[in-house]
Regions:
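Primary mode marks residue(s) on the alpha4-beta5-alpha5 output face of response regulator receiver
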Residues: 27-174
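Bacterial N-terminal signal peptides
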Residues: 10-20
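Bacterial N-terminal signal peptides that target proteins for export
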Residues: 2-10
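Residue-level signal for functionally critical sites in structured catalytic/ligand-binding pockets
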Residues: 2, 18, 106-108
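Sec/Tat signal peptide C-region and signal peptidase I cleavage site
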Residues: 22-25
């Protein structure tokens, strides 16, 4: 049987910490979100976004931070689903900040718990006065005329086979 020394214990703890913080050791999905393959600037922004939303992975913490569940699970087959949107109405303005998303997007797991899959940045048309679309993380927000706002999804806590900024995730189920 191998001998446990302070050095092997330290190495094991460091490896566990590295895997956990990178998302590799999470039980959901086995593929890592980072690196994105979209360049260092996007990777830095995703890392900042993950650090800022780490505490909001538990939906009770999101509610305590001012987010309110606003939708049932949103899906659009055969493209997949988005999940359950938790909105923070106080953040709906013309300001976009990687560390302060307007919407958190959760998926209900078979055991009934909610898993934070990503976020949505949102700017109401009434708040945006410029001609060009607002942008964040090097991406222009999409226009949702029927809903009256600009938006961008970021799948920062789960891999989306359709892409980091895709609207729908085929792996998300309602």
């Amino acid at each position: 049987m191998p001998r446990t020394t302070p050095r092997t214990l330290t190495c094991g703890l460091l490896l566990t910490a590295a895997l956990t913080s990178s998302g590799i050791a999470q039980t959901t999905p086995s593929r890592a979100v980072l690196p994105t393959g979209m360049g260092e600037a996007i990777d830095r922004d995703v890392a900042r976004l993950r650090a800022a939303t780490e505490r909001l992975k538990v939906s009770d913490a999101a509610v305590a931070a001012g987010y309110t569940p606003e939708t049932n699970c949103v899906q659009h087959q055969p493209h997949g689903a988005m999940g359950i949107h938790f909105n923070n109405m106080a953040l709906r303005d013309a300001t976009l900040d990687v560390e302060t998303p307007e919407v958190l997007v959760y998926e209900k797991r078979p055991d009934g718990t909610l898993h934070l899959n990503g976020v949505e940045f949102l700017v109401p048309f009434t708040a945006w006065t410029k001609e060009e679309a607002p942008s964040i993380m090097g991406q222009k927000l999409k226009r949702a005329d029927a809903l009256g706002f600009w938006y961008l999804h970021v799948w920062n806590w789960t891999v989306n086979p359709s892409g980091l900024f895709a609207d729908w995730n085929p792996d998300v189920k309602c």
